């Protein structure tokens, strides 16, 4: 019972129209088929009357044949018109759906715009920009500090490597340099030669002083 009093939607109306148009197309096709059969029968009757020499009957049948062919031509025109109406109905339905979608979208946008505060939105964007700038500055400062730490650490390691290399070379070259050192810096050549293979820390300090290295 509720369906009887329910208001039809646009889709319901269009569906009914399309159903009626399809029924019309089928009826036109049936009429055309009947006219084609009648056309063939008249052609056969005209040939039959022509063979018997009945000219008057041929004229009457020929007029009927002309009317049948005209009516068959009209069925093609009507069928084309019905097809055009069906296509137009589908296009209108599509346009109405698009309009409905646009109306719904417009309502949604209006509701969103009512709830949105332009001032608060602008303030939020500005705060976001400020905080982003602070983060960038903090990150840059941290990177600079880390770079300085690692650079200092590298210099210290490089300096230590040089000191180690010099100390390693002292043990190898000290015997050659002692040959040119003043005689007061060593007791006897034989004693220096005897200690060349095993030099103590005190010997290294004396030898450095003798070479003029503090």
Curated annotation (Swiss-Prot):
Motif, MIT-interacting motif: chain positions: 202-212
One Gene Ontology cellular component annotation held by this UniProt entry: cytosol
Keywords: Coiled coil, Cytoplasm, Endosome, Membrane, Protein transport, Transport
Signal peptide span: none
Main location: cytoplasm
Recorded topology in the membrane: Peripheral membrane protein
Coiled coil ranges: 25-55
Region named Disordered: 178-199
A biological process term (GO) from this entry: endosome transport via multivesicular body sorting pathway
Superkingdom of this protein's organism: Eukaryota
Compartments (UniProt record): Cytoplasm, Cytosol; Late endosome membrane
Chain's role: Probable core component of the endosomal sorting required for transport complex III (ESCRT-III) which is involved in multivesicular bodies (MVBs) formation and sorting of endosomal cargo proteins into MVBs. MVBs contain intraluminal vesicles (ILVs) that are generated by invagination and scission from the limiting membrane of the endosome and mostly are delivered to lysosomes enabling degradation of membrane proteins, such as stimulated growth factor receptors, lysosomal enzymes and lipids.
Family: Belongs to the SNF7 family.
Subunit structure: Probable core component of the endosomal sorting required for transport complex III (ESCRT-III). ESCRT-III components are thought to multimerize to form a flat lattice on the perimeter membrane of the endosome.
Protein name: Charged multivesicular body protein 2b
